[in-house]
Amino acid sequence: MTPNKKGFSDDLSLWKDIFASAAQGKALVYHESTVGAGLPVLSSLKDLVATGDEVTRIEGVFSGTLSFLFNTFAPASGSSNAQWSAVVAQAKELGYTEPDPRDDLNGMDVARKLTILARLAGLEVARPDAFPIESLIPEALASLPSSADGITQFMTRLPEFDAQMANIKDSAEKQGKVVRYVGSIDVPAKNVKVGLQYFDKDSAIAGLKGSDNIISFYTKRYGANPLIVQGAGAGGDVTAMGVSADLLKVVERLQ
């Protein structure tokens, strides 16, 4: 049991080795909290596949940090005059971001979660950097060191690029939409991508609040209305719940 997503999202060979070794040793592998903390994301997907459903698309907001950032920066209801850099600073102060916000803004955390889901859906994704990932780190700031001084420089200079994010938000608003940072998997096309997309304001993704996650499973069985898993996708309490639930499953299997 582990909530650590790195082993399950690294090289495909490692993924195969983990499950091959588990099968050989008749061991159990549970990693529900690697995606969505305590939300039943992996178990829902595994159940769909195990019962013979055909998963065609998976789409959602997989980062509590990025959910908070865009729900605050570009709310679906009302308006916000907040600058992008100010929202990032607020999220950092509230503890929503990693100590270095670039670890959230580079999109790699979302990419790792998409890699795990894609593999469970039957796609042999080589690595989390094997598909398009849109980074929200301005190119001019990407090379700053990861030291405390580098983080300070990043936060100090981020306001220089507020206009870029404002233009993206304005472009969405002119179309009657909002911008969100999402991950999507097109299973038949074997296409995985992570980045910004525009959504209608009355869509489930646009209507998220706070730092909630939402994951939609489009399948042959569910048709046009996807199976949706939504709720808090980050935090110690919900992550601990996910790990504890895995532990209970192991205990039940061993009894």
Tell where the protein language model's regions lie, with residue ranges:
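Rossmann-fold NAD(P)-binding glycine/threonine-rich loop
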Residues: 4-48
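NAD(P)-dependent dehydrogenase/reductase Rossmann-like domain
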Residues: 30, 34, 38-55, 59-60, ...
